Structures are given as C-alpha cells and as structure tokens.
Amino acid sequence: MKQSMHLIVRGAIAAAAFALASGSALAASNLQVVDSHSVSLFTAAGGAFGSGSAISPTLWEVKYDSNTFLAFCLDPHVAVSNSSNSYSSGAFAASDSVKRLYEGYYASSIATVSTSANSAAAFQLALWELNNDNTNLLTGDLRFKNLSNAVVSQANTMLGVATGNGAIQNLYNYTSLTSVNPASQTLLAVSPVPEAQTWAMLVAGLGLLGFMARRRKGASALT
C-alpha cells in the first residue's frame, strides 16, 4: 500500500506540474516509457478490433517534458512504439461520460497497480469503449461474448456509471499526448483541478509578490 500511495502522489504532483505547462500545445518532446502495469493477454472472443484479437489493457508510467506521470491509451489500434517517441501535447476535450469515468474510478484504479492491474485494465477497457466505440462491451468493434472475465465485468460496471446521469464535478484537467509519427499510440493524462481554496492562496501569494515589487520600486524612486 505504501508503494501504491507513493505512485499516486508522485504521479499526481508530476501531472499537476505538467498540466500547468500544457495550457496550450507544447512543441514536440521526447516521451519515454518508465514502467507499465497490465494484465496477461486475453482474447476478446467476440472480436476486439478484429476477430479474436488478443489484448492487454495497460496503464503507462511515462516521462515527458521532464515530468513523470501516469497515462492511459486513447488509441486501441496502435501500440506504444519504442522508435517513434516524439510527442506533442494539448488539452483534451473529455466527454461527460469520460469525465464520469475518471471522477468515479481513476483514483481507485491506479491505487492498486503495484499488487494487481485488474482495476487499471478495466478502466482502460472502459475508456476505449467511451472514446472509440459504442459504450457496450457486448456489441461494436470492441466486444466480448459475455462478461464473465473479471476485468471485462469490472469495466462494464464502470461503463454503467460513466454513461449514467451522475453529476460532473470537473475534478481533473485532461491532456492528450499525440505521437508525431502515427505509428505510436495517443495517450491521455490527467491532473487534479486545484480547489478554490488553493487558487485563493495562489492569487493572494501573487498579489503579495506584486505589492512587494511595487514597494521596492517606490523605495528606489525615493533614493
């Protein structure tokens, strides 16, 4: 649990710093895979982006623009390439269903990856469904004959919440990482939105800095 919490805190802090730098698109920068958390390959017998494709939903830990953070895949048809690692970043317009998925399950899904990747894998399946398919794991391009697999069953539960009518709290900022070469998959990273109290402290701090600067300038003019 200590290792899991360390991963969450480290990822959250790095992603928060990364998000502050990503209010607008950044120039292409090198992306390096630091670690990955996935389940064993299993087959979507009904057809996963092709009849009987073997898939392994994965949570990635990556280093980009001097920051290390966690990211999920947005493009299920493309693998992460070790040779095509030049990426650009920009704000991602998350749908309401994707926001509900993150607000309901992101924190808990990444909390257990050091001991089990099942929740993270289920989260990845749900994200693929919401962003690329028809939100139904029994039909569409990504489909299964049944929901008996533990990861698929958990993903189905997540989809039920994500496509529901739950209130959206806008807890995260969303940033997409897109490979300059389309041969490598697009990734999605998030960072917590600072609470109102945090913003108030930041504004107050900036105001104090401005006041001190004006005071020093005034003192210089008198001497």
Over which residues does each language-model region extend?
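Short, threonine-centered small-residue motifs that mark membrane-proximal processing/anchoring sites
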Residues: K2-S29, A183-A213
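Sequence-pattern detector for short linear motifs
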Residues: I13, Y102, K217-A219
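Short, surface-exposed polybasic-aromatic patches that bind anionic ligands, especially phosphate groups
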Residues: A28-V190
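C-terminal membrane-anchoring or membrane-association module
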Residues: G210-T223
